Amino acid sequence: MLIKYRAEKVIIGSMAFENNRINKGFLEKLKKEIGRGKIIIAIDSKKGRIVTKGWRENTGIRTERAINELEHYCSEFLFTSVEKEGLMKGTDLNMLKKLKKLTKNKINAAGGISSLEEIKQLEKLGVNSVLGMALYTGKLKIKDLRKIAKF
């Protein structure tokens, strides 16, 4: 439905998981309806496990396993390091390095990114940065981001 109204991509979070398992039936149906290229799956990770429903429920699914099993349902992942979200103390670079080796899909990283240096490190890994608190608080400025942006 959203694609019909010209949404370019759809982000699927908790719906990708059901009863502490990957919701393959839902994802397969969605992929058939709108195409893999329009789907981004949110990977909210806390202590190496997928969390859902506003980060309140731990599925027990290892983050690396989720990436492996979900890769063919989507074209991108939105990875959030829940422990780092909003703290502006850096994201989970080690986990992102592992995940990047597991998938050819695009990875967008959120949670804790707070410096131009970190954005450059993520870029070298082939990971996009999603910024929130660092922009909101003024720790990162748009004018500085423009200097390193490639668009």
List each language-model region with its residue ranges:
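Catalytic cores of alpha/beta
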Residues: 1-9, 94-129, 145
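Conserved anion-binding
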Residues: 3-85
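Gly/Ser/Thr-rich helix-start
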Residues: 14, 87, 112-113, 133
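C-terminal helical cap(s) of enzyme catalytic domains, especially alpha/beta-barrels
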Residues: 21-34, 100, 123-151
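Short, well-ordered secondary-structure micro-motifs
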Residues: 22-23, 51-54, 88-91, 119-120, ...
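Alpha-helix-loop-beta-strand connector modules within alpha/beta enzyme cores
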Residues: 24-43, 88-115
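Active-site environment of divalent metal-dependent phosphoester hydrolases
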Residues: 85, 114-117, 137
